[in-house]
Structures are given as C-alpha cells and as structure tokens.
Design a protein with these regions (language model features):
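Terminal substrate-recognition subdomain of acyl/acetyltransferases
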Residues: 1-22, 26, 30-32, 41-57, ...
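Conserved beta-strand in the GNAT
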Residues: 53, 57, 62-74, 85
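A short, polar/charged loop-to-alpha-helix boundary motif
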Residues: 75-81
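Structural motif
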Residues: 83-85, 122
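A short, internal acetyl-CoA/4′-phosphopantetheine-binding micro-motif in the GNAT/acyltransferase core
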Residues: 88-97
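Internal, hydrophobic cores of structured domains that mediate oligomerization or house catalytic pockets
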Residues: 89, 109-110, 116
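Conserved acetyl-CoA-binding loop-helix of GNAT-fold acetyltransferases
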Residues: 96-111
Length: 243
C-alpha cells in the first residue's frame, strides 16, 4: 500500500481555488470531526494571524485517507515575534497504525525553522486522547506538560498566550491547562480501550484529564528548535520512547 502525500499552502491560493479546496478539506474534516461546525474550520484556516496554512493530504490511489491542517501564526510575546504552529489532523481508522501525520508535520516545521532561523517556532495543540498525547510525549523530552518535569517559564508563557483561542481554559495544576477540544468520531468502546494502558504518559494524561470523554483536552506545547526536531526524528526512526 503506497501512500502519496501533497502539501498545499492554503493561504497562497487564489480566491476561487481557496473556495474549492476548502470544500474538499471540509468534506474530509467532517468525517473525522462530525461534531465540529463549518464556521470552526473556516475561522481556523482564515486566521488573520496566519502567515502560512500548510495543508498536508494523504492519498491511497485517488482516495483521500488523511489530512493535517497546520496554520502558522505570527504572534508577539514580550514585544518579540514568534511563530506558533497548530494542527487539526485526522486519518481514516484503517490507516492509523503509523505515525503518518507526525512525520510529515516535522518536515514542514523543519522547513520553516530553516527559512526563519531567527524567530522562535513553537507547536501548541490541545489533545483529548491519552493515546495521542503519548505519541507526542514519548518522542521528545521537551513536549510539555509531562510527568516529573517542571514546565520552563518560556513554554508556559507561550501556552498562556494561546488561551485567546479557547472559549474556556481550566487550570488544573502548574502548567496544566484543560480546554474544550475537537471530538473525533469514535465509539464508546474505542474510548474505553484508550484507558487500558499502564504507560506513564497515559497515566499522566488520565490524572489530569479524566473527563476527556466530555470533549476536554490537555493544552500542550513544544519549542520546535533543532534540538527538539532532531531528537524527535531520531526517536521516530528507531522506535525509541522517552519518559
């Protein structure tokens, strides 16, 4: 099974192409996030702070089987510019066994890091499944929050800056913020199976977000510097996990 990927910067498309491509994105997005509104996706890809909106799509033959929308926002933190990458990703269930979206997202981040080396690049996401949190936390020691480590001040400042994009943020500890998250299409049995793990990252997530069943997610942050990117690439390549 050969998976083909395409990357299109939604922000650079002419108006008519934007309209047509948005309809394609929306159709697939609703397969993954059936409870999300059209307005949510529209605002996400038309964020006025976005300098680029890479959209990575994955195909098997002509069938679209996965999608990752990654707006890159240019914001100000303490009067200095920073870039913040967010992600809205989904893959059809039968293709979820590989780190498909993570691998390509790293490549996109690396290109942007090389293009603008003087401006810090951050990744901020709200994760509502312990399995997905574990995927990220187990690949880099610099993905926060995490068990046994205090979140650095700079990381917390970026996380707090992104509160503006959430309707409600609940602080549940030092550096622990829980907010509404996109609910993917899953069955109750699938959600229950996500809990049957003893991994340290699973336990940490469940300790702080036991109500993820209700659409709550853990706000997470990672600085995408060369140290973090290279560590993640190596851990993915060799199947290594970190605690």
């Amino acid at each position: 099974m050969k998976i083909r990927e395409t990357i299109i910067d939604f922000a650079t498309l002419p108006a008519q192409q934007k309209h047509d491509f948005f309809q394609q994105m929306l159709e697939f997005d609703q397969l993954i996030f059936p409870f999300a509104s059209v307005e949510q996706l529209y605002q996400y890809v038309h964020d006025p702070e976005a300098v680029s909106v890479p959209v990575i799509q994955y195909f098997v033959g002509e069938q679209l089987i996965g999608q990752n929308i990654m707006p890159i926002l240019k914001l100000q933190l303490q009067d200095k510019p920073i870039f913040v990458v967010t992600s809205r990703a989904g893959v059809l269930e039968q293709y979820r066994r590989s780190n498909l979206t993570l691998k390509t997202a790293i490549r996109v981040a690396l290109r942007y890091r090389l293009r603008y080396p003087a401006i810090p690049l951050w990744f901020v996401t709200t994760l509502m499944q312990p399995k997905v949190y574990t995927l990220f936390a187990s690949r880099s020691r610099y993905f926060y929050p995490r068990k046994g480590y205090t979140m650095p001040t700079a990381y917390q400042s970026v996380l707090e800056l992104m509160h503006r994009y959430k309707s409600q943020v609940d602080k549940r500890g030092q550096g622990i913020y829980v907010a509404p998250a996109l609910m993917p299409k899953v069955t109750p049995d699938q959600l229950i199976r996500l809990r049957k793990r003893s991994d340290v990252h699973y336990q940490f997530f469940m300790q702080h977000v036991p109500d993820y069943f209700d659409g709550k997610g853990l706000m997470c942050v990672c600085r995408l510097d060369f140290k973090t990117i290279s560590e993640t690439i190596m851990n993915l390549a060799f199947g290594k996990s970190v605690h």
